[in-house]
Amino acid sequence: MARIAGVDLPQKKRIEYALTYIYGIGLTTSRKILDRTGIDYNTRVHELTDAQAATIRNDIQENVMVEGDLRKKVTLDIKALMDLGSYRGLRHRRGLPCRGQKTKTNARTRKGKRKTVGAA
């Protein structure tokens, strides 16, 4: 089983799609990695040689921020926005959408379960 960046990749999938199981790697990044390493998109994960898996591992380690490091960076970036007191930081702190969506009727995912107000 190919294990790259701490993630077990599905054996029967093509490598270009299997790499997207790693947090921080989408289809575009996956294709760029395969272009740099010279591996065909259509290769299945179980067909990869140890050398090819090692080149993919090295390329990801050198060029792409993935998994724990990326999650930590995103969390710290959001925390920095909140500490600055910017509008986006305030929206994060209040648990509301940050990107301009209306909140009068929607935004249930971000706001959570309804709280009944004024029920007698």
UniProtKB/Swiss-Prot annotation:
Any one cellular-component term (Gene Ontology): small ribosomal subunit
Domain of life: Bacteria
PROSITE patterns reported in the protein's UniProt record: RIBOSOMAL_S13_1, RIBOSOMAL_S13_2
UniProt keyword Disulfide bond present: no
Chain residue ranges for the region called Disordered: 93-120
One term of GO molecular function: structural constituent of ribosome
GO annotation terms (biological process): translation
SUPFAM superfamilies: S13-like H2TH domain (SSF46946)
Alphabetical keyword list: Ribonucleoprotein, Ribosomal protein, RNA-binding, rRNA-binding, tRNA-binding
Pfam families: Ribosomal_S13
Function text: Located at the top of the head of the 30S subunit, it contacts several helices of the 16S rRNA. In the 70S ribosome it contacts the 23S rRNA (bridge B1a) and protein L5 of the 50S subunit (bridge B1b), connecting the 2 subunits; these bridges are implicated in subunit movement. Contacts the tRNAs in the A and P-sites.
Complex and partners: Part of the 30S ribosomal subunit. Forms a loose heterodimer with protein S19. Forms two bridges to the 50S subunit in the 70S ribosome.
Family from the record: Belongs to the universal ribosomal protein uS13 family.
Annotated protein name in UniProt: Small ribosomal subunit protein uS13
Organism: Sulfurovum sp. (strain NBC37-1)
Gene: rpsM
